[in-house]
A protein has these predicted regions:
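Structural preference for solvent-exposed beta-strand-turn elements
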Residues: 1-147
């Protein structure tokens, strides 16, 4: 799983090149409705948030799972059968690999949630929305490298 994050991060770094003309910062909000703010994604009982900056500096902030939260998640993970289980810890390794190779500042936060599958899905969807926004070309900075 970490290798997938590394490969995807390398692909992003190569595709973005010098980042000329992109927004660079991604909070996943819709420009037609700027009041939506950051990339919040609900998934049943979970709520996840992601903010990303393709700054050239690698850093992952992974928050929201305190020891009490992990005590709820680990038993639920153990109930999954091996064919459908995706260990929650692997998600963090994916995002660490991505942040390192894409050279981005990536903030992922679980605001609340209990079910491991829902948590992982909400985090990945929030990440996708924020990355999509950050990689879009902004006509106001066309041809320039964002600062």
């Amino acid at each position: 799983v970490e290798d997938c994050g590394i490969a995807l991060g390398q692909a992003f770094a190569q595709a973005l090149g010098d980042k000329r003309g992109i927004r660079r910062y991604g909070a996943g909000f819709d420009p037609r409705n700027p009041f939506t703010g950051e990339s919040y994604v609900p998934m049943d009982e979970c709520l996840a948030r992601c903010v990303i900056d393709f700054s050239g500096r690698s850093y992952l902030v992974w928050r929201g799972l305190n020891p009490l939260g992990m005590k709820k998640i680990l038993p639920a993970e153990k109930k999954q059968d091996a064919s459908s289980a995706f260990r929650f810890g692997l998600a963090r390794e994916f995002f660490q690999g991505f942040a390192n190779e894409a050279r981005c500042n990536l903030h992922l936060e679980l605001l609340y949630g209990d079910e491991p599958h829902h948590i992982v899905e909400a985090l990945f969807k929030a990440f996708a929305k924020a990355a999509d926004f950050a990689c879009q070309h902004d006509p106001r900075i066309a041809g320039r490298i964002p600062s």
